[in-house]
């Protein structure tokens, strides 16, 4: 399990081009999402929140998120998939957190609906998958 997922980390800039900035932490290459990537130079240290996006890429978001490991926050349900759970927008770029059907009521007619707000925190399983955990 990767212990930087879902938390704030500091990593060194190892590569940059016109579109992307990359940092490395503990041998892991991470794409940086920042409004001003041109401000960073090779060798600079960057602090940000690390997660895996929907394209299965490690991403570091330099803007501190409203939720992270151990910190609960509100997110909006954006989709419901009855064989998986509910997808919640928590403000991470390119990633919605899923609250597993295992953590939801047995009866799907009482599940949260699109537009509902949930109080959740991210968790990481032993396969480095991030899930939303209800308060």
Which role does the model predict for each range below?
Residues 1-6, 53-74, 133-135:
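Short boundary/loop segments of OB/S1/cold-shock single-stranded nucleic-acid-binding domains
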Residues 6-8, 36-48, 105-121:
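Short nucleic-acid-contacting surface segments enriched for D/E, G, S/T with interspersed K/R
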Residues 13, 50, 75-77:
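Conserved hydrophobic positions within beta-strands
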Residues 16-18, 50-56, 81, 122-128:
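Short, charged beta-turn/beta-strand-edge "cap" motif at the junction between a beta-strand
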Residues 18-23, 84-87:
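Short aromatic-glycine-enriched beta-strand elements
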Residues 25-55:
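N-terminal, Lys/Arg-enriched amphipathic/low-complexity engagement segments
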Residues 29-35, 94-103:
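A short macromolecule-binding patch
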Residues 67-95:
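Short, solvent-exposed interaction modules
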